[in-house]
Amino acid sequence: MTEKEKMLAHQWYDANFDKDLETERVRAKDLCFDFNQTRPSDDSRRQAILTELFGYTLENVAINSPFDTDYGWNVKLGKNVFVNSNCYFMDGGGITIGNDVFIGPSCGFYTAHHPLTPKERNAGLELAQPITIGNNIWFGGNVVVTPGVTIGDGSVIAAGSVVTKDVPPNSLVAGVPAKVIREINENDAPKN
């Protein structure tokens, strides 16, 4: 089994010293660099770079620069997704984002675990677990989502939260570590 196959099977793998994975990360970093150097008004060039990075054509997805990801091909973005500036997708474990999702500035989606023991950590071992984001979700700025987390449809993650556990649908979540504050319901709709 290759290190990439181990990564995709959510097993411990060599993240630092495997040449094939390193080559794929360098490819993604080069594409992110190119994307981040384009003018915001050059939409056709920016979309072409993102299509090459992710491996598919995006549907009404806006990503502000700077943006960074480890591989790109392991990120699945739904329709009508907005990613604000300075976001990082550590996508070794896979990141799936549903439709109609707003991601505030400086958010991080981290799929990698490292060993607690220094010998194994220094050997480059890593365990990647998926992050799954449902539909109609809003992330405030500076949110961190950790490996293996699923966030249910209709939820709001308050700015500065660190999400370490699954979030039920229609939940307002805040804090470090993030906790469910309450359920979101029709009474939360703006009134004139």
Curated annotation (Swiss-Prot):
Look up the EC number in the record and give it.
2.3.1.-
Leader sequence segment: none
Q: Which GO terms describe its cellular component?
A: cytosol
The entry's keywords: Acyltransferase, Repeat, Transferase
Q: Can you say what this protein is called?
A: Putative acetyltransferase SH0499
Q: Does the keyword Acyltransferase apply?
A: yes
Which organism's genome codes for this protein?
Staphylococcus haemolyticus (strain JCSC1435)
Q: Which family does it belong to?
A: Belongs to the transferase hexapeptide repeat family.
Q: Name one GO molecular function term.
A: O-acyltransferase activity
